[in-house]
Amino acid sequence: MNDIKERVARGLLAIGAVFLRPEEPFTWASGIKSPIYCDNRLILTAPDVRSEVEAAIAETVRREFPEAEARMCTATAGSAHAAIAAHLMGLPMGYVRSGAKDHGRQNRIEGKLTEGEKVVVIEDLISTGGSLIETVEALREAGAEVLGAVSIFTYGMEKGKQRLAEAKVRAVSLTDFDEIVAVAEAEGYIPAHTVPGLMAFRANPSDESWMGGKK
């Protein structure tokens, strides 16, 4: 697993899908100042990294959730990754909308789902865990047995871990914030003196003291 974590981290950094900028923080929609920006959509534009990531998703599902009978994902964010990985495994795939459509059959869950079907949710990233939990709850309400989730990347935030534990969602990620920072430092993407601030951000994103007075 550690080998996967490092390979995926290297790939995401190489294509700019994960970008670290501790000295010029990004601003998230929530208003939080962040030293990291993640855009896993860029994986789809890089065939070598895409192949690595989708194969890693399939390998992780086989290892962690061998009973899986189908793949589900959140609409748009994890759709392409779930579709490719499901194809590699020969499993059916569907996705869950944030809300039911207001036209047609008014489906929230797209794709065939049978009562008691054992599914794994594919996510592109996990921060606070909110969207993943909503997806899992929708699948459970529809009668699925959700074995867990696989994400490409996780910030590893304590709030997210706590929320997932409370919702009884087991989540496994290909790589995480700590691995990204370690690889980024080793390969010269960031200077060593920025690492303590990065780790302080991960521990408490709402506390801007990690910026050392910068606003």
Predicted segments with their positions:
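PRPP-associated nucleotide enzymes
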Residues: 1-122, 130-215
